[in-house]
Amino acid sequence: MEIITVMHTARSATIEIRDGGRHFTRSPYRVVVNGQEVMTTEKVITSLFGLKPQTAYQVEIYDGDRLLGSTAFTTEYEFVTLDVTRFGAKGDGLQDDTHFIQAAIMACPENSRIYIPAGTYRITSLFLKSHIRLELEEGAELKAFKDREKFPIFPAMLESYDEQDEYNLGTWEGNPLPMFSGIICGVNVEDVIIYGQGTINGNASKADWWDNPKVMRTAFRPRLFFISHCKDITLQGVRFCNSPSWTLHPYFSNQLRFVGLVVENPADSPNTDGLDPESCKDVEILGVRFSLGDDCIAVKSGKIYMGRKHKTPSENIHIRQCLMENGHGAVTLGSEMAGGVVNLTVEDCIFRHTDRGLRIKTRRGRGKDAILSNITFRNLTLDHVMTPLVVNAFYFCDPDGKTRYVQSRDPYPVDERTPVIRKMTFENMTCTNCHVAAAYFDGLPEQKIEEIVLKNITISYAENPKCDVPAMSEGVEKSSRRGMFVRNVSHLVLDHVSISGQEGEPLETIGVDKVEVRE
């Protein structure tokens, strides 16, 4: 067994227990820090808090009395701690603590900590600055007010003085549109870590954010955590809940880490995606537990205006050791992906009770820069996922989503509006209690999916499966226990793929140029 240090700050650390488990370890283990037992863990990704700065730590993992492995690190330097209660914050659940906490943030020097002790701190929007560490103690809650008139507004676009360029702030579902600023918000900042065992609560279940969710009222709904044009940002350990819309939304940002978080929203809350990196690069999502009302992770890169202008894909995304429950899709690409998604890997994760496992949503009109390339899913456990694998090039989003141009299965000319799906690989996946279909791959007839490789995949069905549509597009009929449907693919490889218990044929193909079956 290998034990590694994933990250450490002056006050915290995260270790990874590599015992072959996915999200959960194979057994509960004792965690001993500098000779003192501090916890029992069942998580592959385990975080430690309450550490001291500039201190050497030895972390040992035991199965009973048997030492399995260890790792060592020295915590970082810390200059000073700024306790927000010394700036006037009360944490009594009544006072508006926004300005007091913001004062501590703005006064914080480099290599220092903003400390939020236990209590309930009512806030509107807090704005981050560069080179800070913000800790939420166990029992600390940042709880948003429900009154929308209290929140600042980010304009969609501001024109430059010379009228040659523009400055984008607000965004909504892939377009530059006015929005309320995030509850936690950062613009053009770098080197920030937010960590701890506390909670950031959007309080949307007590507000009207979820009423008429697609209607802009003054501005579009805020995100719980929003960063724009930032780099070197880390979130560790914190619980995020009750978001007004998308929960964590990094936008045109790079070098991001999301480690050991909990992201929770009610199952019926609209558009409360868990984590949506949009036109972001070098993103690690590690050991996060999602349970919410929409897609757990949705990787995006804007609609066609932003895709054409900025040509910024989401790239180098690594998702591992996560638990994704109760969402529409576990990992979704799109539908706003006009800038493309390149080099995405999902591994060692568990998907439970989601409508779909992998979910690719695209359509005509996303544009020629909407390229999906080098997408890999491996070493995954899926249980009670309605349809484990879905690639849908006819997604009926947007006002024109049900027009003939978007929905026609007849070939259209390939032009600057036509998206591209290249190679996707799925390997070492066990899918049990499937309901609707084993897989549903539906490419464009004029721009076929270039290659799909499935290797070492087993799929079986629930005893009493639900009947539903495998993909959101026109003409797709409801089904249950359907096999694998593949349409408009240039090259399909089935390498040790087992589908058992389906009704009808295990494989239906239409417009597939080449099929390789290896047993």
Locate predicted features.
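Extracellular/periplasmic carbohydrate-active domains that bind, remodel
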Residues: 1-519
